[in-house]
Amino acid sequence: AGCAIGAVAPEITGRDTLGNPIKLSDFRGKYVIVDFWDSYCHWCREETPWLRKALEAFKGKNFTILGVSDDRKKELWLAAIKEDHSNWDHLLLPPKTDIFTTYCIKGIPHLILVGPDGKILAKEMRHEELTDVPAKFIK
């Protein structure tokens, strides 16, 4: 399945905050925390400061974050990104995309680490794990 550690992360496609096409494979060659979240998910938005810490910790080390949301209201999605200062790439899924089944997600927030080769290195990370776990791989 596409959710096992060591499996190649299934492709995720959508639109970025400017409406341009964006996909997970655009980030091949980098370590990527994929953050599955929604604007109305309080717990998801509580991860934002931890994600900012990770971005700072691995600055210049081939690392990035991709926020993935299935928000139905684009304006709420954009407002949450701005409000939370989530200054990384974001992808809004097309309606009715069943990414939750593809990635075996039982609930959000759901955060995984994908390696430069596109394989899943870790999953279900929270809080300080967002820095501690990538540190095991990023030298």
Feature-to-residue mapping (PLM):
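Conserved hydrophobic packing residues within short motifs/helices of P-loop NTPase cores
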Residues: 34, 66-68, 91, 112
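Conserved redox-active cysteine motifs that mediate thiol-disulfide chemistry
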Residues: 28, 36-53
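Alpha/beta-hydrolase fold active-site loops
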Residues: 31-32, 109
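Thiol/disulfide oxidoreductase modules built on the thioredoxin-like
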Residues: 85-86, 93-138
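N-terminal "domain-start" segment that seeds a small globular fold
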Residues: 1-24, 133
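Active-site acidic short loop of glycosyltransferases
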Residues: 28-30, 60, 86, 105
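Structural microenvironment flanking redox-active thiols in thiol-disulfide oxidoreductases
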Residues: 46-84, 95-101
